[in-house]
């Protein structure tokens, strides 16, 4: 009988990326792969775009809020209906395991898996669990964590960050692919790369627009998320979105100015890039980026600047500070043991699935 596994997770790219890394490995080993998500979510878009042989099953999903809202009442029914749909899907497929990367759409399948006796494995990217994973943890077999946790919860297993990204071996790729950009850049200036999510990028975009004098001291790469800003001019390259150029652009950067999302932070750690983290505050998030940034700064991987302190003088001071302590940051990143290759995590997950199914 063909082994089956169900993946779930969505809402943001960060809740899909690891699944897309793992799915080809399961397919290669002869597994039949299914995905439970939202037809209108990024998870459905990414699965279709990947071309992977994956059967997609859609369920109802609702956002779980930490504050009172009448919408919560409707969403409770949506989540309940999503659990019923997931029960039907999982009972019909009879998979050996379910793997969840989080997000609100993942809660019903994890609950359903537990009710049907199917081992459920969850991956948590942030230092503290989001609401969805806090609920899902109660129904999980194992929760893998990216960050070392102070809490000693019995089902937690620290694995570090799972990433395909590695430290660049040379700058030749960047030189070939971005020859036009390099013509506008001054090789005698340091290159800063700004990258953030949708809300985070807008703050960076405005900061760069408001301070054209930055271009006198640095080459600037701005991954903006806004095609109307696309520009290539003296000491400035603004691009809305990158895929194949992501790694070459990172190779060009001497320092990356980023938000505090864990996926990006650990990719930069893997590439050993100097980082200045400007995390989203509690007014725009649940505070997870502040926690992630604090974790990275206390371990000597990066420097932090709070968004409310983002003025040109403060920014320039922090950038100078990072470059002054460059060797310290690189030493800390080089000696870090917080990264794991996709292959090693796949082997660990496979072993845990085998162990859990034997126990059942």
Curated annotation (Swiss-Prot):
Any Pfam family from its record, for instance, is Glyco_transf_28
What gene makes this protein? murG
Q: Which Gene3D superfamilies match?
A: Glycogen Phosphorylase B
| Name of the protein in question | UDP-N-acetylglucosamine--N-acetylmuramyl-(pentapeptide) pyrophosphoryl-undecaprenol N-acetylglucosamine transferase
- Annotated UDP-N-acetyl-alpha-D-glucosamine binding lies at 12-14, 198, 289
Q: Which residues form a coiled coil?
A: none
What is the purpose of this protein?
A: Cell wall formation. Catalyzes the transfer of a GlcNAc subunit on undecaprenyl-pyrophosphoryl-MurNAc-pentapeptide (lipid intermediate I) to form undecaprenyl-pyrophosphoryl-MurNAc-(pentapeptide)GlcNAc (lipid intermediate II).
Q: Which InterPro entries match?
A: GlcNAc_MurG (IPR006009), Glyco_trans_28_C (IPR007235), GlycoTrans_28_N (IPR004276)
Organism for this UniProt entry: Streptococcus equi subsp. zooepidemicus (strain H70)
